[in-house]
């Protein structure tokens, strides 16, 4: 009986496995999507995207940069606006893992279905070189590196 108790005790003392801890940064909406259609009639339609980091608690700020690229069918200020206070560089203080990007869509004054009516937010850089941009998944190594809005009729 003593042998069984000792074996159980020492089995619990096996060397710990190192957990998978690959830090990453990604972008999505509140539903977890990486794309959305916005109707041309949408007016004052507010959308919030979120840039997330996933890592152990950092002892310093993590800076994440993104760019917003509008297709030739969209014009900032006329079709949409990235709300004031949303910077193209987000600073994640220690303990902060999610930062918002606020966008407001306006009713399309002139909608050309043949034009490129997309607005894409793409994560471009992270101050921490060991962070992966995007989620890692089998078969597709960088999910959610960008978020695309498509203006539809």
Language model features: what each stretch is:
Residues 13-153:
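Short boundary segments that mark the start of a structured unit
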Residues 1-13:
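Sec-dependent bacterial lipoprotein signal peptides
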